[in-house]
């Protein structure tokens, strides 16, 4: 009888030890899992709109390099390296910041750089950016998925809400956008972001006989005869303000010159086609309505 009791006691002890060991192992696994370090990307963004999207989604701290058009948010100036313009950028500055992910638009980027990026071995996403409300919302979704974020709908909802502020304009004003930088003056033709923005805001692009940007000439200004001259804020300042613009050859002969209808907006806001698109359209729409009074 004593032997039976002894055997039973030993079996209970062995079972208890195994149970304790199993519990200990399980606890170790849970602890290891909960303490696993979170990984984050080192992102290079080569488009102002894409930079804004990544930042608005809460990943600004992961951006290590940007292109020259990425002026917003301003806090990036202190944390991300300016890599230059995608039209003239080389691969070396990009590689120097050791990115794990490169995000770029198919607009403007030079083919040689694009080829080198795609063969660099670094994860790369090149997006087809369409300059429209729906195209921008699609871009936001695509960028969000590329960085592993699913909380993008709030950004698209904000665009829709801002677009509700846009008021119809009975007679569409002809708007000429002038890009002014130093002595370089260019005007926006068809299929440019500025043409699309002007259309969304209720205006009509004053130039429709060529695409992209071309140098400003007095003949082109007079022929276009815009009702409104539109600048980036920095460009208007560089041109000498309204008085400087009115002295430009040909301007005084246009409706815009005669009525001194000159408007300006922040360049980063109106050209990026990112999360602030609705804000940009509503702002331009308001200026166009005011200029018609």
Question: How would you describe each model-predicted region?
Answer:
Residues 1-15:
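Sec-dependent bacterial lipoprotein signal peptides
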Residues 90-107, 122, 217-234:
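Proline-aspartate-enriched helix->loop->beta-strand connector
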Residues 17-25:
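Bacterial lipoprotein signal-peptidase II cleavage site
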Residues 42-97, 101-107:
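A short, structured surface patch at a secondary-structure boundary
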Residues 41-42, 134-147, 154, 170, ...:
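Structured C-terminal subdomain patch of bacterial secreted/periplasmic proteins
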Residues 67, 190-213, 233:
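His/Asp/Glu-enriched short active-site or ligand-binding loop at hydrolase and phosphoryl-transfer sites
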Residues 112, 129-141, 176-193, 237-240:
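Extracytoplasmic ligand-binding site segments that recognize negatively charged/polar headgroups
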Residues 36-57, 150-203:
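Basic- and aromatic-lined ligand-binding clefts that recognize polyanionic substrates
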């Amino acid at each position: 009888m004593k032997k039976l009791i002894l055997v039973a006691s030993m079996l209970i002890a062995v079972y208890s030890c195994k149970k304790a060991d199993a519990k200990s192992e399980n606890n170790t696994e849970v602890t290891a899992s909960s303490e696993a370090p979170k990984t984050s990307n080192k992102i290079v963004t080569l488009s102002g709109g894409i930079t804004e999207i990544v930042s608005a989604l809460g990943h600004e701290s992961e951006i290590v390099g940007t292109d020259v058009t990425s002026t917003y948010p301003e806090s990036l100036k202190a944390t991300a390296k300016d890599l230059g313009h995608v039209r003239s950028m080389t691969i070396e500055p990009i590689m120097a910041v050791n990115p794990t992910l490169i995000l770029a638009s198919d607009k403007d980027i030079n083919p040689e750089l694009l080829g080198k990026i795609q063969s660099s071995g670094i994860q790369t996403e090149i997006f087809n950016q369409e300059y429209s409300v729906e195209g921008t919302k699609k871009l936001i979704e695509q960028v969000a998925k590329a960085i592993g974020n699913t909380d993008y709908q709030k950004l698209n909802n904000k665009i829709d809400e801002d677009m509700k502020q846009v008021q119809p304009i009975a007679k569409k004003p002809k708007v000429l956008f002038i890009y002014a930088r130093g002595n370089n003056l260019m005007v926006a033709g068809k299929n440019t972001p500025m043409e699309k923005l002007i259309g969304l805001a209720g205006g009509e692009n004053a130039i429709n006989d060529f695409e992209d940007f071309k140098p400003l000439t007095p003949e082109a200004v007079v022929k276009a005869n815009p009702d409104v001259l539109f600048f980036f804020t920095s460009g208007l300042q560089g041109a000498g303000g309204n008085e400087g613009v009115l002295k430009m050859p040909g301007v005084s002969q246009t409706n815009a010159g005669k009525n001194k209808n000159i408007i300006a907006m922040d360049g980063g806001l109106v050209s990026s086609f990112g999360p602030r698109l609705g804000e940009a359209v509503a702002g331009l729409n308001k200026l166009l309505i005011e200029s018609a009074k």
